[in-house]
């Protein structure tokens, strides 16, 4: 039994589960692609570049590829895909040291970050709009979920590092300020004195 596909066209993807679901799902790639990166870094980068081609004009990242790897589903509604995409690109860049890869992916990083920032309706630096659609699809989260907010803060930290490495200082400074504001709001909103609440 295999769950990976590498086409003659050079496309690569893995099923979310054996014989089911989509290929190269952003959320499952985020959770389970360390082995691919460690053993076949070029295949991992290829997956990410394939996904970047299908980034929507407003910055939203795809959920998964169709079985023939020629397109993506219409599921652009999951709000954790963008931060996961940014974190994956940063991880792959830091692991491989491939600055050309980072430069190719940079416009997609900017769009993904800008789109997620639009989900901050109250200006506290954390997403709070349309946060129900995410990887935990059976959980009815609302408002500012700790899961989404923590991914966003991690993506901000990663984006600052990538911006600095590319010499994009204005972006680095803006995201660093947002990271500081969001980190403060994360504790104020979600810490209940014993643990971080699921959402606030």
Predicted regions and their residues:
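Catalytic cores of carbohydrate-active enzymes
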Residues: 3-8, 13, 24, 30, ...
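Aromatic-rich carbohydrate-recognition surfaces in CAZymes
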Residues: 21-126, 144-163, 176
């Amino acid at each position: 039994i295999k769950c990976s596909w590498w086409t003659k066209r050079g496309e690569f993807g893995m099923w979310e589960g054996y014989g089911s679901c989509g290929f190269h799902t952003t959320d499952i790639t985020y959770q389970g692609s360390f082995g691919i990166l460690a053993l076949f870094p070029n295949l991992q980068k290829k997956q990410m570049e394939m996904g970047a081609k299908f980034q929507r004009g407003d910055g939203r990242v795809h959920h998964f590829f169709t079985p023939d790897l020629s397109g993506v589903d219409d599921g652009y509604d999951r709000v954790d895909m963008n931060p996961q995409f940014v974190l994956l690109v940063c991880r792959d860049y830091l692991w491989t040291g491939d600055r050309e890869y980072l430069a190719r992916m940079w416009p997609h990083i900017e769009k993904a970050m800008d789109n997620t920032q639009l989900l901050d309706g109250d200006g506290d630096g954390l997403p709070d709009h349309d946060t129900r659609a995410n990887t935990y699809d059976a959980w009815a989260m609302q408002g500012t979920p700790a899961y989404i907010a923590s991914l966003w803060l991690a993506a901000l930290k990663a984006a600052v590092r990538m911006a600095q490495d590319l010499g994009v200082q204005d972006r680095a400074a803006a995201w660093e300020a947002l990271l500081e504001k969001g980190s403060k709001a994360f504790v104020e909103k979600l810490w209940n004195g014993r643990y971080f609440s699921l959402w606030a």
